[in-house]
From Swiss-Prot:
Domain of life: Bacteria
Pathway(s) the chain acts in: Purine metabolism; AMP biosynthesis via salvage pathway; AMP from adenine: step 1/1
One Pfam family recorded for the sequence: Pribosyltran
GO BP terms: adenine salvage; AMP salvage; purine ribonucleoside salvage
Protein name per Swiss-Prot or TrEMBL: Adenine phosphoribosyltransferase
InterPro entries the UniProt entry points to: Ade_phspho_trans (IPR005764), PRibTrfase_dom (IPR000836), PRTase-like (IPR029057), UPRTase/APRTase (IPR050054)
Subcellular location: Cytoplasm
UniProtKB keywords: Cytoplasm, Glycosyltransferase, Purine salvage, Transferase
Catalytic reaction(s) noted: AMP + diphosphate = 5-phospho-alpha-D-ribose 1-diphosphate + adenine
EC numbers, comma separated: 2.4.2.7
Length: 182
């Protein structure tokens, strides 16, 4: 498995803006727009992910709304693979599978078109999002992929917020790769 060195990780981490107390006091927000706006860092990241996934024999890459769309679609372009969106409720126009997950105060839901994987049984799918925190969205997305008859071969995140344990929960279901462990 191809992973970055500590020096390479620092290079990418330094390209992400840190904003304390956003969106509310006590939260440290990691703003990826500065990475997206840095062509050298962005191309370095995409080259790394292309190298990592080029031999995975993937059929599709699924990205979760909304920042997961950004990275998933760019990886799709690098690997010449189709993109599958996993969206918030009511945003997809055709028949969907849905999966509900718990939030700190309440619940939310994600949806996937029933024919997203073109009825290819056991299609090999890479799940992509910008970060994993508690794991709720990622686990629900994994379950949607399974519900649609495909296989999530790995979940890839730009950042893993280690203290929130989401990656550990998801690793019970599928392989997890995080470019940056925070």
């Amino acid at each position: 498995m191809i992973k970055l060195t500590q020096e390479e990780q620092k290079y990418l981490f330094d390209s992400i803006r840190i904003i304390p107390d956003f969106p509310k006091k006590g939260i440290i927000f990691r703003d990826i727009t500065t990475l997206l706006n840095n062509k050298e860092a962005l191309n370095f990241l995409l080259k790394h992910l292309k190298e990592r996934y080029k031999d995975y024999n993937l059929d599709f890459i699924a990205g979760t709304e909304s920042r997961g769309f950004i990275f998933a679609s760019m990886i799709c372009a690098k690997l010449n693979l189709p993109f599958v969106p996993i969206r918030k409720p009511g945003k997809l126009p055709f028949e969907t599978f849905s999966c509900e997950y718990d939030l700190e105060y309440g619940s939310d839901k994600v949806e996937l078109h029933k024919d997203a994987f073109k009825n290819i049984q056991n299609a090999r799918v890479l799940l992509v999002d910008d970060l994993i925190a508690t794991g709720g969205t990622a686990i629900a997305s994994y379950e949607l992929i399974q519900k649609a008859g495909a296989k999530c071969v790995e979940a890839c995140f730009l950042m893993n917020l280690k203290d929130l344990n989401g990656a550990n929960k998801l690793e019970k279901l599928t392989s997890v790769y995080s470019v940056l462990e925070i």
